[in-house]
Amino acid sequence: MTTSIELSSYRDQHYKGSRFEQERSLRDSSTLYVGNLSFYTAEEQIHELFSRCGDVRMIVMGLDKYKKTPCGFCFVEYYKRSEAEAAMRFVNGTRLDDRLIRVDWDAGFIEGRQYGRGKTGGQVRDEYRTDYDAARGGYGKLLTQKIAPNPDNR
């Protein structure tokens, strides 16, 4: 089955299976990865936006693996591939909570993938950020650790 919405070059490095199986899963999937969300965006807001393209089966919010708080991404699964294609076409690059969101194909949600993969528990991209982004927790986590005073040195 070919799709009118092309696959991006991004591939989940933790995918369990061959590259061929991953490509097939992406081409058949009705699950989307949604990135660049504000840490304060609620699941209800995501549902409201994505349900304009079809019946949403499930939304899984991305969580900091240590704090269990939202960390700026989610997975949206539709019942039909055609509904997910509509979301790729019409929602990708739109604004939600005053942020341009990224929508990409996902091979399908697997338990455990809802947790950030960064050293500090969130997303890797938020660890190395040097700019201040209030909607994503302020400065990058590793930068914050470097400039924060060590209470043991007082």
UniProtKB/Swiss-Prot annotation:
Transmembrane as a keyword of this entry, yes or no, is no
In terms of InterPro entries, this protein maps to: NCBP2 (IPR027157), NCBP2_RRM (IPR034148), Nucleotide-bd_a/b_plait_sf (IPR012677), RBD_domain_sf (IPR035979), RRM_dom (IPR000504)
PROSITE patterns named in the record: RRM
Q: Give yes or no: UniProt keyword S-adenosyl-L-methionine.
A: no
One molecular function GO term is: RNA cap binding
* Residue ranges constituting the RRM domain according to the UniProt record: 30-108
**Gene3D superfamilies given for it?**
3.30.70.330
Q: Which keywords does the record carry?
A: mRNA processing, mRNA splicing, Nucleus, RNA-binding, RNA-mediated gene silencing
Which GO cellular component terms are attached?
Answer: nuclear cap binding complex; nucleus
- In this record, what's one Pfam family? RRM_1
Q: Can you tell me which residues bind mRNA?
A: 10, 33, 102-106, 113-117, 123-124
Where can this protein be found?
Answer: Nucleus
GO BP: any one term: mRNA cis splicing, via spliceosome
This molecule's function is given as: Component of the cap-binding complex (CBC), which binds co-transcriptionally to the 5' cap of pre-mRNAs and is involved in various processes such as pre-mRNA splicing and RNA-mediated gene silencing (RNAi). The CBC complex is involved in miRNA-mediated RNA interference via its interaction with Ars2 and is required for primary microRNAs (miRNAs) processing. Also involved in innate immunity via the short interfering RNAs (siRNAs) processing machinery by restricting the viral RNA production.
Into which family does the record put it?
Belongs to the RRM NCBP2 family.
Query: What is the protein's quaternary organization?
Result: Component of the nuclear cap-binding complex (CBC), a heterodimer composed of Cbp80 and Cbp20 that interacts with m7GpppG-capped RNA. Interacts with Ars2.
Name of the featured protein: Nuclear cap-binding protein subunit 2-A
Gene from which this protein is expressed: Cbp20-A
